[in-house]
Regions:
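Glycine-aromatic-enriched surface loops/turns that form tight recognition elements
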Residues: 1-66, 70-237, 242-317
Length: 317
């Protein structure tokens, strides 16, 4: 059965609180209740080794803890809250409003790994020798398959960016947690691309408006498309940041899209409809070269618009 995007569950239904752990029913992941369980920032290699030590000791009765991959940690993010950028009413404690490592390496610069800022939900990459926090997670159902899709990463690297054998590393490339969309994720019909993973429909031409625009102009362009029934439809819109990020493949770069994507003229930066909770003058942007998630100043014409159709989605399942 193909997993789909859905809206968020109510928070009182989403999180199941144990003594020291929290199960996220929306994703099938178990997190430590204490988001600073490991106390201090660590390098990426140190973090991977620390997780191995947790598993050896059977921490909280489990031997399959891991550093979350990028999609797993991203699944906790709320773009409506800050400090921390977690859902309102979440049950976690000691959440550090700074960067947390993921187990996913940057495909273009493999001496860097992805991390997410829990103060504001930015998704960036940094040198693996840097020191950041770690939040252990494990999958609670279907073996290694959470309700999320895999990141796409299938290769492992050391801190210098050299390819290594994945066995025993605990990296995203070894664990490959989640569902894999085997083939034919995208199909085309009259210059429109349907994404079977998300039920969203994108334009094949990822640069249909030819030039970068400011944020308000992106909405005006989508409205104009609807008035003129562009491509036979009148429900085009600017995608939210979670929908844009759903296209990213961690094994790819320039652009960071799945190998079988069918899109043309993909640009480096795209506006989302999601306003920054830190500063309403900024909106979230997807950086398509590597797949980073950052912000752009709304009045500046620096980013492109890639219209989408379909029921607005908030998280993958």
């Amino acid at each position: 059965m193909t997993k789909k995007f859905i809206g968020h569950l109510p928070n009182n239904d989403r999180f199941l609180l144990g003594n020291e752990t929290v199960i996220d029913r929306q994703t099938g992941l178990m997190w430590t209740k204490n988001a600073s369980l490991l106390d201090l920032p660590q390098s990426w290699a140190e973090a991977l080794n620390t997780i191995k030590a947790l598993n050896k000791s059977g921490h909280y009765g489990y031997h399959d803890w891991k550093i979350p991959n990028r999609k797993e940690l991203f699944s906790l993010m709320s773009y409506e809250t800050i400090n921390p950028s977690l859902p309102i009413g979440h049950p976690f404690i000691n959440v550090f409003s700074g960067y947390y490592w993921t187990s996913s390496t940057c495909a273009r610069l493999p001496n860097q790994a992805w991390y997410i800022h829990l103060g504001g939900a930015r998704v960036f990459k940094g040198m693996k020798y840097g020191s950041y926090m770690v939040w252990p997670v494990r999958t609670v159902e279907n073996g290694n398959n959470s309700k999320l899709f895999q990141t796409g990463q299938k290769t492992c690297f050391n801190e210098s960016g050299v390819v290594i054998d994945c066995l025993g590393t605990g990296q995203d490339g070894e664990v490959q947690s989640g569902f894999e969309f085997k083939k034919n994720r995208f199909t085309e019909n009259k210059q429109i691309i349907y994404d079977h993973a998300t039920d969203l429909t994108w334009l094949r031409n990822a640069n249909v408006h030819q030039n970068p625009v400011d944020w308000n102009s992106a909405f005006n362009l989508a409205s104009k498309m609807n008035i003129e029934m562009e491509y036979g439809h009148n429900d085009w819109r600017v995608p939210n940041i979670i929908e844009l990020e759903s296209l990213v493949d961690m094994d790819r770069h320039s652009p960071a899209l799945p190998n079988d994507h069918l899109f043309n003229d993909v640009q480096d930066y795209y506006w989302s409809s999601t306003t920054s909770a830190y500063n309403m003058d900024y909106a979230w942007v997807l950086y398509m070269v590597d797949g980073a998630v950052g912000v752009g100043y709304k009045p500046l014409s620096e980013f492109y618009c890639w219209p989408v159709r379909g029921e607005e989605r908030m998280i993958i399942r």
